[in-house]
Amino acid sequence: MDLKNSSALPHITVATVVEKASKFLLVKEKANGQIVYNQPAGHLKSGESLTAAALRETFEETTWRIKITSLLGIYNYLSAANGVTYIRHCFIAEPIWQEPEAKLDSDILDAVWLSIDEIIQKTAELRSPLVLTVLKDYVAGNSYPL
């Protein structure tokens, strides 16, 4: 088996939970032909640290500069859509400033701020169950030092 290119290997991803005025920063994106909501998230690049990836992905998908304050958790998710296992490292971050002139990634339709209630109402439109899982952990006060 060629492990280097095997779909049996988990994909390492990062995500951020960013809260401002009781609203959470989410991205509205097109994935697999559907419009869905997700935390700013993405894959780790070769040689990149987890926190650097989280900073980069959040900026590329939202145009927000953030400060990572802690680790929320590490989550394992098996996608029924493609059979891939994702290991998501989710960080808690504070918004610092937005660069409105910056362009969003091409697959991102918009960056939005939604309350937890608004997110729950969009459960069917969430990219994966992890979106709500990590928010529930955040609201419960989970946090680990970097």
Model-predicted segments: where are they?
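Nudix hydrolase/Nudix homology domain
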Residues: 34-37, 106-146
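Active-site-adjacent beta-strand/loop module that shapes the phosphate/pyrophosphate-binding cleft
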Residues: 77-100, 112, 134-139
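Short, solvent-exposed loop/turn elements at beta->coil junctions and helix N-caps
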Residues: 4, 72-80
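A short coil-to-beta-strand element that immediately follows conserved catalytic motifs
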Residues: 65-73
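Conserved Nudix-box catalytic region and its N-terminal flanking loop in Nudix hydrolases
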Residues: 20-60
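Acidic, metal-coordinating catalytic segment for phosphate/diphosphate chemistry
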Residues: 1-15
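Residue-level preference for beta-strand/loop junctions
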Residues: 8-10, 35, 85-87
